[in-house]
Design a protein with these regions (language model features):
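N-terminal FAD cofactor-binding segment of flavoenzymes
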Residues: 1-28
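Conserved beta-strand termini and adjacent loop/short-helix elements that scaffold enzyme active sites
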Residues: 16, 71, 214-215
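Conserved N-terminal helical subregion
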Residues: 19-105, 109-118
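A structural signal for short hydrophobic beta-strand segments in well-ordered beta-sheet cores
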Residues: 76-79, 143, 169
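Short acidic-glycine loop/turn motifs at beta-strand connectors
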Residues: 81, 147, 172-175
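Central beta-strand plus flanking loop segment that forms part of the substrate or channel wall
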Residues: 112, 120-153
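Active-site substrate-recognition segment that forms the wall
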Residues: 119, 157-188
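FAD/FMN-dependent oxidoreductases across multiple families
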Residues: 189-238
Length: 238
């Protein structure tokens, strides 16, 4: 999609050190993977979300057809009845009362979206949704690898599901990567993973990620004070 529609964003990401990983390189050793002619079209872009959003913003700012409004808050939707059916959304209302008319409103605020309440205020039904609790917390810490000491011959992409615990390692831009532990919410002993020292001791027990932290292969991205980021209330939504 980026290559076809936003090549300037892809160029910025490449300059920032984003890595492109072909689908064949992600297959675990020993797993049969018959190649297909279109495999080269499936590419993972390894970069941090902040880097991606920076590149996307830079592209938006440079386009005359797009107006970027910063420091404003959307407080609700504007709408009207047409033909006696459901209300039609006609724009958004800002916190200061300003109304911005629109032919199409796209809400990308994620799981904390106020769209259901805003639609209800217009007399419209909320979007249909199915949500299932995942039953896990995410504990994530970011690192910067030292090329001379990092494990060689691997993409740095790790995904391990051990049943009682899940581990994932994601390569990023500029020699960065993150390690995430998915821990069950009903296991109080694992809540200590929010402490960086306990988090590191925990990682050392797993061969899939331990080499990336052993013998100075990497350092926490902001030094010893790099926090372990915790994400809860995780749901799968459809």
């Amino acid at each position: 999609v980026l290559l076809a529609h936003l090549p300037d964003v892809l160029d910025r990401l490449r300059l920032a050190g984003a890595r492109e990983i072909g689908i064949a390189a992600t297959v675990p050793p020993g797993m049969p993977f018959p190649p297909r002619a279109d495999d080269e079209d499936v590419v993972l872009l390894a970069c941090r979300r902040a880097t991606f959003e920076w590149a996307l913003r830079a592209s938006v700012v440079g386009r005359d057809a797009i107006t970027l409004r910063e420091g404003v808050t959307v407080a609700g939707l504007e709408g009207e009845q047409r033909g006696g059916g459901r209300p039609t959304v006609t724009g958004v209302r800002l916190a200061d009362g300003t109304v911005i008319p629109a032919a199409l409103v796209v809400d990308t605020t994620g799981r904390r979206s106020h769209a259901p309440q805003w639609l209800a205020a217009l007399g419209a039904p909320a979007p249909r949704e199915r949500a299932v609790e995942t039953g896990i917390f995410y504990y994530t810490r970011f690192y910067r690898q030292r090329r001379a000491r990092a494990p060689q011959g691997t993409t740095g992409l790790v995904a391990s599901d051990l049943g009682w615990i899940k581990l994932a390692m994601f390569p990023g831009d500029g020699d960065t990567f993150s390690i995430t532990v998915g821990a069950p919410v009903d296991e109080p002993r694992l809540k200590g993973l929010s402490d960086p020292h306990r988090f590191e001791r925990f990682l050392a027990a797993f061969p899939s990620v331990a080499p990336w932290r052993a013998r100075g292969a990497s350092v926490p991205i902001a030094g010893a004070d790099t926090p372990v980021l915790v994400m809860g209330q995780l749901k799968n939504r459809l």
